[in-house]
């Protein structure tokens, strides 16, 4: 473990490198990013990113710190700040490979730093991984906020079934084989200020044309989907936010900015109740895949919904 240093986001953000035993590719690290609230607090949020992503959503973090929560984010092994030169980006053969990263982050947030009221926040694939971790570990979360969690593939039942069978075979035999897919870059372009968006992020850590999808990783995701769809109990109130609609545009335009162009939101709606016994789902009209990076009007609704949910189910439950 290295002492926290100033993060690539600059002051007041810090980053702490956490070392783990090497795997088949070599050395492994995760990175814990942190910003304190203005006043000392026992409340915190721990955020987990999605695929081909890393933590850069500072406006989202500022929502939490203004509410009196210390904010933490973890860049998981082989992702974002934690991607090392010898590694296959975002590769994991089992989503449980990420559990030590979350365990280490949780220990630092709670045992070391003394927070006793902690919300787990997660986006896209991170929402799947975080939910499986919460179900298995039962850490005593105060709440969980999932931003467009990846709970199933899109497409017909037949295509999802056939695809899963193929991925199971190929991913088991040749886990580092790259899965062919159509990548148009529309989504990342809609976000970045040098293209059609307003946000700033490192295009090496979050490439406009994404990262390769490895068969072993997709196999791990499909196994995670099956486990979630059999029913979880994350043990806390859960808010699921997504765009109200999905679109598969063929050109850059308004549809890219006003829909989820990555995941099928109908699958998010369908499977959200499988997360636990207390789940609230809200679809945000006009929102992007990462709802916190939406255009101003739907983004304002995101924060309104999140604030109301926290007031109703989470903030008042501190003890």
Roles of regions detected by a PLM:
Residues 1-39:
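N-terminal cap/lid segment of alpha/beta-hydrolase-fold proteins
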Residues 34-76, 83-85:
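Short, surface-exposed "cap/lid" segments of acyl-processing enzymes
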Residues 112-124:
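Alpha/beta-hydrolase fold nucleophile elbow
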Residues 125, 129-213:
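Alpha/beta-hydrolase-fold enzymes
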Residues 278-319:
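Catalytic active-site module of serine/aspartate enzymes centered on a nucleophile-bearing elbow/loop
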Residues 91-111:
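Alpha/beta-hydrolase active-site loop
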Residues 51, 75-80, 150, 285-288:
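Short beta-to-alpha linker loops that shape the active-site pocket of alpha/beta-hydrolase fold enzymes
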Residues 178-279, 283:
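Serine-hydrolase catalytic core
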């Amino acid at each position: 473990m290295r002492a926290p240093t100033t993060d690539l986001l600059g002051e007041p953000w810090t980053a702490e490198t956490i070392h783990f035993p090497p795997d088949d590719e070599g050395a492994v690290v995760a990175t814990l990013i942190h910003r304190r609230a203005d006043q000392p607090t026992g409340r915190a949020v721990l955020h987990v990113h999605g695929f081909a992503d890393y933590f850069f959503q500072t406006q989202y973090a500022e929502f939490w710190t203004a509410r009196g929560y210390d904010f933490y984010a973890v860049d998981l092994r082989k992702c974002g700040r934690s991607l090392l030169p010898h590694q296959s980006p975002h590769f994991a053969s089992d989503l449980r490979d990420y559990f030590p990263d979350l365990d280490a982050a949780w220990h630092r947030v709670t045992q070391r730093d003394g927070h006793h009221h902690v919300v787990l926040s997660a986006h896209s694939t991170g929402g799947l991984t975080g939910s499986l971790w919460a179900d298995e570990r039962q850490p005593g979360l105060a709440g969980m906020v999932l931003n467009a969690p990846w709970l199933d593939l899109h497409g017909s039942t037949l295509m999802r079934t056939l695809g899963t069978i193929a991925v199971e075979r190929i991913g088991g035999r040749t886990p580092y084989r790259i899965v062919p897919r159509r990548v148009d870059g529309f989504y990342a372009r809609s976000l970045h200020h040098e293209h059609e968006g307003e946000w700033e992020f490192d295009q090496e850590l979050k490439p406009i044309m994404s990262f390769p999808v490895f068969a072993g990783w997709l196999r791990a995701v499909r196994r995670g989907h099956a486990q979630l769809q059999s029913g979880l109990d994350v043990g806390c109130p859960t808010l699921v936010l997504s765009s109200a609609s999905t679109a598969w545009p063929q050109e850059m335009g308004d549809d890219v900015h006003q829909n989820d162009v990555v995941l099928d939101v109908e699958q998010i709606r369908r499977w959200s109740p499988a997360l636990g016994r207390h789940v609230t789902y809200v679809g945000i009209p006009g929102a992007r895949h990462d709802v916190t990076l939406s255009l101003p009007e739907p983004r304002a609704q995101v924060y309104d919904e999140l604030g109301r949910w926290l007031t109703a189910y989470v903030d008042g439950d501190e003890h």
